[in-house]
């Protein structure tokens, strides 16, 4: 058994298999996942686990060089946007319409579904390198 970091075997395996510039997505309970995209469903109840709990856990093991967020988060969920920026202070942020973010899930290694119940709590993480 792992002592630290991600103990969910599916999430741990996805992160371990990431290469430079690969994408991993984390999102709220309502985000539709395209057919063919691996879905890792961690949601057990409303807000369990929260989006930020899962994001912070993934960030313990994943080097991120860029993130993609829905443009709508700026107006519809500014508190979550601030939480994300605090968790990833030196990472480039790209915004796109929510409809484009949903389409982009087809390019991710997996989508991790949380129990989050706030709008636009979805992110695509672009993997960096550690050297």
UniProtKB/Swiss-Prot annotation:
It is found in: Cytoplasm. It catalyses: beta-D-ribopyranose = beta-D-ribofuranose. Its EC number is 5.4.99.62. One of its GO terms (biological process) is D-ribose catabolic process. Its main location: cytoplasm. Pathway: Carbohydrate metabolism; D-ribose degradation; D-ribose 5-phosphate from beta-D-ribopyranose: step 1/2. The active site is at residue 20. It is an enzyme of class 5 (isomerase). GO terms for cellular component: cytosol. Substrate binds at residues 28, 98, 120-122. One of its GO terms (molecular function) is D-ribose pyranase activity. Keywords: Carbohydrate metabolism, Cytoplasm, Isomerase. Catalyzes the interconversion of beta-pyran and beta-furan forms of D-ribose. Belongs to the RbsD / FucU family. RbsD subfamily. Homodecamer. This is D-ribose pyranase. The gene is rbsD.
């Amino acid at each position: 058994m792992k002592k630290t970091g991600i103990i969910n075997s599916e999430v741990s395996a996805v992160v371990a298999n990431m290469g430079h510039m690969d994408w991993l997505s984390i999102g709220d309970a309502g985000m539709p996942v395209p057919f063919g995209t691996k879905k890792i469903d961690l949601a057990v109840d409303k807000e369990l686990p929260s989006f930020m709990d899962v994001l912070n856990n993934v960030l313990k093991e994943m080097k991120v060089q860029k993130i993609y967020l829905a443009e709508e988060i700026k107006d519809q969920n500014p508190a979550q946007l601030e939480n994300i920026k605090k968790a990833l202070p030196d990472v480039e942020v790209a915004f796109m319409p929510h409809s484009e973010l949903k389409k982009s899930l087809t390019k991710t290694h997996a989508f991790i579904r949380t129990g989050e119940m706030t709008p636009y709590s979805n992110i695509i993480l672009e993997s960096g390198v550690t050297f």
